Amino acid sequence: MNENDKVAGLPELAKSVIWMINFGYLGIQIAFTLETSQMSRIFQTLGADPTKLGWFFILPPLAGLVVQPAIGSLSDKTWAPKLGGRRLPYLLIGMIFAVIMMLLLPNIGSFGLGYGSVEALVFGAIAIAILDVSANMAMQPFKMMIGDMVNDEQKSYAYGIQSMLSNSGAVIAAFFPFLLTILGVANTAKKGVVPQSVVISFYVGAVILVITSLLTVTKVHEYDPKTYARYHGINEEDNKKDGIWFVLLKKAPKVFWEVSLVQLFCWFSFQYLSTYATGAIAANVWKAFDPASAGYQLAGNWFGVLTAVQSIAAVIWSYILAKVPNNHHKLGYGISLLFGAVGYGSIFFIKSQNLLILSFVLIGISWAAMNTYPLTLVSNALSGKHMGTYLGLFNCSICLPQIIASLLSFILFPFLKCSMPAMMLTAGISGILAAISVLFIKETYRN
């Protein structure tokens, strides 16, 4: 930007544009929810040792830890108008590979590699790793485009739409296996083979991912480098220099680290929910411990329904949080996380299938806050310089806690006598620590 260029500030966008910026997130969240809600079931069906599940659940956050900052940094320097612009080319690439892996992953048990064989589990782990890398590549552009294109007055609305579409995608994905079972699709299969209810769910999710992603790519027009610089009050060259991650982290606003502390405990809890909730529900409600049993598969389906309940609660609570005044962000954040802590911990005690609905409503309240407040608090404190890199680096506050939780599970799970319900009680304790950590946040805004 030269002396003759006037800082314009980001313009107000039509609501239809904001919806299109976020629309592809629906498909991405369907892919992620299918993965997180069915991964434990898939790998135990393939013959994975329950005490070693933590290794498989390290892969998603490990992918995000590397991929999202890299995509942020690379896209800050990218301008490819024929492929969509700055962020959208990475959405296209990620979507293509994610779809391939979604078609492959649930069929691994049908390749004749053998129940519990090293080949089957390694093949599955590689497929999960590629799916995670590609899904993370496709996900990050949506977060960055809001920072790039949406002004401060509309930003909370934009993130609210993203949260709503995210949770709507989770609802759709979570209901797929349950609905297909009702429609007569087989929910059990021979030993080592993933049931057709899960396989078809992944197929449908892949189709939706393609449609929603292409709608965003074709309908959204990113700002060219000159316009972006003028709107953000920076020079065109600013995003092409001084982008070393460690240097940027040293300059990160204090709230970046304060929110990251809260994220540590939030995602510790959520990692154990993804890893152990199906087994905990199977043990407490169905008294089932064999992953091949009908009871265990019913628990897997019910966990999918509960995940949908969580997402519906999150959609409703997100609307409530949008009405919370800016000076009460911390109150809304802390109370929401405390509700979630009760939800996690209650799974340890509850033996009733229907009573678990209340647990997941509380978890959904926490989930809404986890999707709303962190990005709002951090992006409000950032300038337009290296926006993608900073938001990618902030994603590490999601990934690192999950890696830590997975590694710690190799000690904690045996210590708790391999009790999956006890792991959910641990998640509840971590949720309480997350709520307490909110007290240390001091909200700031960019100049």
PLM region spans:
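Intracellular loop-helix junctions on the cytosolic face of multi-pass helical membrane proteins
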Residues: 1-16, 109, 114-129, 135-138, ...
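Helix-loop boundary and gating motifs at the non-cytosolic
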Residues: 5-63, 258, 262, 266-290
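Loop-to-transmembrane helix entry
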Residues: 49-59, 196, 287-311, 422
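Loop-to-transmembrane helix entry/capping segments in MFS-fold secondary transporters
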Residues: 50-51, 152-162, 300, 382-394
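Helix-to-loop junctions at the C-terminal end of transmembrane segments
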Residues: 66-83, 316-329, 413
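C-terminal ends and interior cores of transmembrane alpha-helices
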Residues: 91-117, 339-351
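Intracellular juxtamembrane helix-capping segments at the cytosolic ends
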Residues: 137-150, 369-383
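C-terminal transmembrane helical hairpin of 12-TM major facilitator-type secondary transporters
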Residues: 330-373
